A protein has these predicted regions:
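Glycine-biased, small-residue-rich flexible motifs in mid-sequence functional cores and linkers
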Residues: 1-149
């Protein structure tokens, strides 16, 4: 495991955001509202930010002031994406790499998502059905699961 950024974020309460790759359109705006609310409340959000919706939520969170933990299912960035550099500079981002793989795979994503669930105090699962790769985690960590209406 490799860390870059503010490791003190490991000690604060964290809410995980995990979204299926297939989302109903009505859920998208709700997730944007949720991200805006988390930013206003300065709640730490942890995610892989790899699905389309997760990456969109990261854009909303990046505009706020709350801490963010980004967990990669691949090796650490060789070059930090431009959007993330100001967050590192402001000491409100922690990037964690949980794999030495060059690219994310289904296996490394599963491992990353489980790690996120284990570290989070609460988890918002979005668009998860029985066919979703996140379904097993949603069942395993249902005591941490929250809803956003």
């Amino acid at each position: 495991m490799e860390y870059l950024g503010n490791t003190e974020l490991l000690n604060v309460p964290k809410t995980a955001f995990l979204a299926s790759s297939t989302i109903q359109p009505d859920m998208v705006l709700k997730c944007y509202d949720w991200a805006t609310q988390m930013a206003k409340e300065r709640q730490c959000v942890v995610s892989g930010f790899s699905s389309h919706l997760e990456s969109e939520v990261l854009h909303f969170l990046a505009k706020g002031k709350q801490p963010i933990i980004l967990v990669l299912a691949r090796e650490m960035y060789k070059q930090i994406p431009a959007e993330l550099q100001p967050l590192l500079d402001d000491n409100r981002l922690l990037i964690i790499s949980v794999s030495k793989a060059v690219r994310q795979s289904k296996a490394t994503a599963r491992s990353r998502n489980k790690y996120i669930c284990e570290m989070a105090d609460k988890i918002l699962f979005v668009g998860v059905t029985e066919k979703s790769s996140l379904y097993q985690l949603k069942e395993e960590f249902k005591e941490k699961s929250i809803k956003y209406e």
